[in-house]
Amino acid sequence: AKSYRYNLDNEKYELTLEVDRDDIEDDNIGVYSMVIDDMGQQSRLWPDDLVFAALLAGGTETAYDGTAFFSNSHTLGSETIDNLFASTALTADNFAAARAAMMEYSGEDGESLRVRPDVILVPPALEVKARKIVQASTIVESGAAVDNVLRGLCEVVVAPQLSTSAGGLDTTWYLLDTSRPIRPFIFQQRMAPELVSLTSPNDEHVILRDKYLYGVKARG
């Protein structure tokens, strides 16, 4: 079997806030404290931003075989693997077809990869459709209520980062298998988010500028 290699380039994260010392001392209602807490929250969401940016670039960034990550012409041994269902609206039938296609993936040796999609990832515009498909107890067929055989097949995950306003498409949805040791996404944390501050009267920044400095940094 061939071996394939991916390079994960680390990126730095930095967010800095400079505040007049007087403003901090006069902040009786804790506004700046909330702003600083929000900086910490933003840093904890940074890995999500990196992952979704990579996902949205899947139509152009190349995979192991030199074709786009999402493509209908991946080569694996003698097999051609299609992981792109272009212009496929989110419907119950299309969901079932895409799920079945993924479960039929095989490796270089021709053996089944045993893929079992367990997450449907959608932008907010598709949340209701997705939940109806995999969470509704019954559906209507030919005017009659019948059991929904797709119920419980996938967990619905909604990501605002996938919306049209965020650079994605409100009509695009993804099926993932998160049950395996090799996950759909990898975040390589090198340095956890760290909040640093220059607020001591002896800090040079405070002495020279009469300002407090708060910052968050991370790397991954």
Locations of regions flagged by a protein language model:
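Generic ordered-secondary-structure signal
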Residues: 9-10, 46, 53, 64-69, ...
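Homeobox/homeodomain signature
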Residues: 7-9, 14, 59, 110, ...
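Sequence/fold signature of self-assembling virion shell proteins
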Residues: 72-106, 114-119, 125-220
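Alpha-helical scaffold segments that mediate packing/assembly in large oligomeric complexes
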Residues: 22, 27-34, 41-104
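Structured alpha-helical segments in the cores of large, soluble enzyme domains
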Residues: 2-9, 97-109
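Flexible, glycine/threonine- and acidic-rich loop/arm segments that mediate assembly and lattice contacts
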Residues: 1-52, 207-220
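Conserved beta-strand segments of the P-loop GTPase G domain that flank and frequently precede/overlap
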Residues: 18, 121-122
